[in-house]
């Protein structure tokens, strides 16, 4: 069965990084990397090259951890900063609150503490209302 385009290529969507295709050069690089076999789980030549590039730009101690999309990056970032019972204080309109589909709580096990605001910005007073029980994993 021939492959056909099933969508209107003139339509643009900016609600998510998952809406658009990749640049043709990226797709060509993926196709080239797809030829043949490589060891898996980060032991391949492409991951080694990625680490070299990151070390060059960000210093010898920098390491890259590739993830599938923005949600994966956000969950990984939060997971790296918080204990499993940790929490993030976020405005009710924050991206992490409304657009991640519960992934931080489901995957990372952290809690998103939803703070209603008039302008989408947290103030010290709003944070203080939620920031009680530090050091208590049962909070």
Regions found by a protein language model. Give the residues of each.
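Conserved PLP-anchoring active-site segment centered on the Schiff-base-forming lysine
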Residues: 80-98
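N-terminal amphipathic/basic leader segments beginning at the initiator methionine
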Residues: 1-29
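Conserved N-terminal alpha-helix of the aminotransferase class I/II PLP-enzyme fold
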Residues: 23-70, 92-93, 97-98, 103-105
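Conserved core of the PLP fold type I
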Residues: 62-82, 113-120
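PLP-dependent aminotransferase-class I/II
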Residues: 108-139
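Solvent-exposed alpha-helices and their adjacent loops that cap or buttress functional pockets
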Residues: 5-8, 55-59, 80-81, 105-107, ...
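Short, conserved acidic/polar surface loops in the N-terminal third of protein domains
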Residues: 76-79, 99-103, 107, 123-126
């Amino acid at each position: 069965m021939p492959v056909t385009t099933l969508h209107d290529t003139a339509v643009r969507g900016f609600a998510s990084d998952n809406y658009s295709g990749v640049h043709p050069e990226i797709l060509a690089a993926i196709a080239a990397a797809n030829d043949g076999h490589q060891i898996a789980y980060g032991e391949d030549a492409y991951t080694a090259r990625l680490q070299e590039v990151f070390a060059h730009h960000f210093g010898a101690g920098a390491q890259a951890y590739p993830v599938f999309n923005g949600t994966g990056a956000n969950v990984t970032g939060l997971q790296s900063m918080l204990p499993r019972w940790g929490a993030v204080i976020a405005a009710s309109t924050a991206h992490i609150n409304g657009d991640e589909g519960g992934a931080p709580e489901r995957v990372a096990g952290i809690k998103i503490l939803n703070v209603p605001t008039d302008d989408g910005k947290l103030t010290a007073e709003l944070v203080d209302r939620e920031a009680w029980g530090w050091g208590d994993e049962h909070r």
